[in-house]
Amino acid sequence: MKVLILVLLGVVILQAAPIRKLEDLLPTRNPPQNELVYWCTYANQCDFCWECIHGICRNRIQADWPVIHQNDWIINCTVSRWNGICRYYEGPRGHIDHEMDCANPTYHTYPHIEYMKIYVRDDL
């Protein structure tokens, strides 16, 4: 009897709280602010993840990342989402295209972090 009550309760809860599907995102170079953590985790070299002033750049989302010199490692990106598939395009149109399941994202291996030019203050 207890099992039946638990099953019925589970069915009622599932029907009361419908599963939210992520809205589609048309290709953009400026993803919504509330999605920056997601995009900057998996596409961290994209220019929208960095704030650069006078050639010195700080990651806007991940505070533990080093401060770096603005260089070719930071690239223009376009991101999009369609039917649960997240994509980002790096560099010039058609340069590198990475596709992943939005619910089970994966890291892209290019460009490698060793190409970052870490900023070191020499006046300390």
From Swiss-Prot:
Quote any Pfam family the record assigns: v110
Keyword set for this entry? Glycoprotein, Signal
Source domain of life is Viruses
Q: Which residues are glycosylated?
A: N76
* Residues spanning the signal sequence: 1-16
The record describes the protein's role as: Plays a role in virus cell tropism, and may be required for efficient virus replication in macrophages.
Q: Which family does it belong to?
A: Belongs to the asfivirus MGF 110 family.
What is the protein named?
A: Protein MGF 110-8L
Organism for this UniProt entry: African swine fever virus (isolate Pig/Kenya/KEN-50/1950)
